[in-house]
Regions:
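Short, surface-exposed ligand- or partner-binding patches at beta-edge/loop junctions that are enriched
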Residues: 64-65
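Rhodanese-like catalytic fold shared by cysteine-dependent sulfurtransferases
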Residues: 1-21, 29-60, 69-107
Length: 107
């Protein structure tokens, strides 16, 4: 099983290569309204158990939040539920904005 955390640069590299990834934004809708990563699916942390079927995919599941704490917990929980490909993007959308795409608003 791969490490639970993945760097934003690795996520970007995999996306740019055309690899199919399921990017899951586990933040709240009010946070999503402020900034988002194009192509990500919003599934707030509290609704993950009810949406587990969406995450039952052959694609690698990359979770992210604001700084990487909530997404780490979600990825860990998903692995316990059998989603072995679940990973957390280290540093969250904040790090994505700083290192990958400065057009993504910081908050």
């Amino acid at each position: 099983m791969p490490e639970i955390e993945i760097l934003p640069s690795e996520v970007k590299k995999r996306l740019d290569s055309g690899e199919k990834l399921l990017l899951v934004d586990v933040r709240e809708p009010k946070e999503y309204a402020i900034s988002r990563i194009e192509g990500a699916t919003l599934i707030p942390m509290g609704t993950i158990p009810a949406n587990l079927q969406i995450l039952d995919t052959d694609d690698d599941v990359i979770c992210f939040c604001h700084h990487g704490v909530r997404s780490f917990d979600v990825a860990n929980w998903l692995r316990q539920q059998g989603v072995a490909s679940a990973r957390s993007m280290a540093g969250g959308i904040e790090r994505w904005s700083l290192e990958i795409d400065p057009t993504v608003p910081r908050y």
